[in-house]
């Protein structure tokens, strides 16, 4: 009888449902918090600098510089802060650009993107309340810029962002892997200066999604999805195919589900 009881107990132990991946849950929560902070900082800085003018109106260089610096600092610090927890993506284009080369699982990538979009929406809704209804700047094409031109611009800007990410962080030969996440802020700032008056230099579908959702302005919004996702994916393929000599590189995140 005792043996029978022991066998039953053992069977329950073995059939017990697997524990949830706590690391994945923490990573998704980190993406939620980090993306919220990034979008909140970027959008509020744009509002404070007076970047919420008429759609297509060029920003003065001082305004553009202020917006670029805010995004560069926020991106560099927040990516560094979350790198050891989630990889510090903050951006669906980064997540997809890393996914295409197998550095993250499809399920985790999907959860990351959902968290990033939710965070961006919450940040912009809160900002509308805290700012007393100030105009929320929405990414829009500059005067005379056609959608296809804007699309190509976003492809190139995001390509450079992911190319730098692969070169400084994912490539095992990189000599700056420990500070690579912080340095990514520099390319974000440079690209913001380069493309700010053409497309707004989004490079990040989540950064564009929140303001569009909060204001209901979706004009040419597809440009800010297709461009960054295509640019990020191309960068992943190009860098690993042509420049990643050691194919036994370490994945960005160990223990992905």
From Swiss-Prot:
Keyword Lipid biosynthesis included in the entry's annotation: no
Short sequence motif named NPA 1, residue ranges: 91-93
Pfam families: MIP
GO molecular function list: water channel activity
Membrane topology (UniProt): Multi-pass membrane protein
The entry's keywords: Membrane, Repeat, Transmembrane, Transmembrane helix, Transport, Vacuole
Transmembrane segments: 32-52, 63-83, 107-127, 150-170, 178-198, 225-245
Example GO biological process: water transport
Matching InterPro entries: Aquaporin-like, Aquaporin_transptr, MIP, MIP_CS
Cell compartment(s), UniProt: Vacuole membrane
GO CC term (a single one): vacuolar membrane
PANTHER family: AQUAPORIN TIP4-1-RELATED, AQUAPORIN-8
Domain remark text: Aquaporins contain two tandem repeats each containing three membrane-spanning domains and a pore-forming loop with the signature motif Asn-Pro-Ala (NPA).
Name of protein: Aquaporin TIP4-2
Organism: Zea mays
